[in-house]
Amino acid sequence: MNITESRLPQDGAIKHLDDGKQLDLRVSSLPTIHGEKIVIRILDYSMSLAGLETLGFTDENYEKVKTALTAPNGIILVTGATGSGKSTTVYSMLQLLNTPQTNIITVEDPVEMKMKGLNQVQVMSEIGLDFNTTLRSILRQDPNVIMIGEIRDDETARIAVRASITGHLVLSTIHTNNSLNTIERLLDMDVERYLLGSALTAIISQRLCKKLCPKCRKSRPTTEYEKNLFKKVLNKDVPAIYDAIGCDECFNGYKGRIALHEVLLLNQDIRDAIINNIKKEELRNLVYDKDNTKTLLEDGLVKIINGSTTIEEVVKVIDLDTDFGENDVEIRNAFLGKELKKDEENFKKEQSEIIDTL
């Protein structure tokens, strides 16, 4: 970062050793009328790279990811919003693939974590070393695995897909909400349907929730709205779930974060559907077939049942516009019932507080 420049937004990084732990600090500055606004993200990869098995995947989803990583070629995409743990998931997958016999090359902006055994390239656009230039050169380096930090534009998407069908396993991230949305986004980026249908191996969509403190969490009976939601989505009768309480270890009832996952392994039916340009709702039905993919909502509800998080946290990260199909009327109503009930309770609470002040 240029310390003499305060008129332009800037990004930078700081390495900090804290009690023997190497922390990466990501700094972002934004010029405002009152001066520079600074945000610092604190990244502790010593904790986050404890292994793929520690990232909160259910047994079923974990096996799907491992199956995808055994493919000799194809493209595996990790999707989600900024700060949803995509990089941690990608690096954890690279850990599994990283052997002396495997030529792994990454192209990143920035290189988020240095790993032994990887050939990591830092993008420097100011001298012409951008994603596309680097990717073309990487293809001449005889790689087994290519990791692209992020698919940001049409050309990068096309190069990544073409690389994956020429004998390379490609890992990357993209800012989309779920599996279906990812397929649509890649098609919007002018990736040819026949190439995408052949190349796409798996899509891992994820979001982060606060994790319940195991010391102070407290069980309580489910409400009628919650029972309805569990029944409609999981077809389960759930008599009780956990609430956040707060103690001297966590202060607010939560300690750490846990990921919600949606893992799609593409089968031949989905590949054919992409190539043949079938209707969106038909593609949705294939993607979210009960025997194929568990949605983010389903994964979230499972983690509520096992006491990992709360229904309030899952409700925060589920998007009604993208996480439900047009035909999921009963599930939408059950989900909305929880939201409406929460609004009603908040209204009554606010009314009570106003009356108390009179």
Show the residue positions of the predicted features.
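Short, flexible helix-loop junctions that flank or precede catalytic/ligand sites
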Residues: 1-358
